[in-house]
């Protein structure tokens, strides 16, 4: 299974750090965020990855290169301006192919095991989402989860972790080159009962602000 790492975002809330560094290259625990993902993908048996880039994207390409030092073969999907998540995926489909792929937000830190996801069979599902307990800044959550099925009901709700196994069919409605968010497509898949998921309760952190970045650094430092 190929992987796609989403790394095209501007990182407005992390300025001024992201005025000089793309968010995926912000250092955490002694290495850039994206390095954690690349190393874990290779360890999970993934051999090919696509990275979408836009803001300061050449810095990411210079750092990762062709991916060989991470044990991966890496290709780049370049966006003149960010196309949002679904738009970025649709733009990258010629590189991803027609089979399901593992989607990872490169600007989050997540210790979920990639190996079972790389081996996951979607069957008739359009996507399989990794969900996490709601962080303070997203207390309302995104989805419910019951018996492995993702919903939008009134039960316990969880936050989408930015990690998923996804079929290219999910973004079929999106025209290449068009800007499009992912959430409406996920909720449409919920309505069709074609979204599965799992709950991950290990270390996950959205590093969208300096405060969250500092919190993650403290958590990692406490382990050493």
Positions of the model-derived regions?
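N-proximal low-complexity "stem/linker" segments adjacent to membrane-targeting elements
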Residues: 1-4, 10-16, 25
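Conserved beta-strand segments of alpha/beta enzyme cores
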Residues: 24, 73-75, 126, 194-196
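Catalytic-core segments of class I nucleotidyltransferases/pyrophosphorylases
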Residues: 46, 102, 109, 114-122, ...
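Conserved N-terminal catalytic core of the sugar/cofactor nucleotidyltransferase
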Residues: 2-5, 27, 31-105, 114-116, ...
């Amino acid at each position: 299974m190929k992987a796609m790492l989403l790394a095209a975002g501007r990182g407005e809330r992390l300025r001024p750090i992201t005025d000089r560094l793309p968010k995926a290259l912000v250092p955490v625990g002694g290495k850039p965020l994206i390095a954690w993902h690349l190393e874990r993908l290779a360890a999970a048996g993934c051999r090919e990855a696509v990275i979408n880039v836009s803001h300061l994207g050449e810095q990411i390409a210079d750092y990762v290169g062709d991916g060989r030092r991470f044990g991966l073969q890496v290709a780049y999907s370049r966006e003149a301006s960010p196309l949002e998540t679904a738009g970025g995926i649709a733009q990258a489909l010629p590189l991803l192919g027609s089979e399901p792929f593992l989607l990872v937000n490169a600007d989050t830190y997540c210790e979920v095991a990639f190996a079972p996801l790389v081996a996951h069979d979607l069957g008739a599902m359009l996507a399989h989402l990794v969900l996490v307990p709601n962080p303070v800044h997203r207390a309302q959550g995104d989805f419910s989860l019951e018996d492995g099925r993702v919903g939008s009901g009134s039960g316990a709700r969880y936050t989408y972790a930015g990690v998923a196994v996804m079929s290219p069919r999910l973004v079929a409605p999106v025209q290449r080159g068009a800007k499009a968010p992912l959430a409406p497509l996920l909720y449409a898949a919920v309505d069709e009962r074609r979204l599965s998921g799992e709950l991950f309760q290990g270390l996950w952190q959205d590093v969208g602000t300096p405060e969250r970045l500092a919190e993650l650094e403290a958590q990692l430092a406490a382990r050493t």
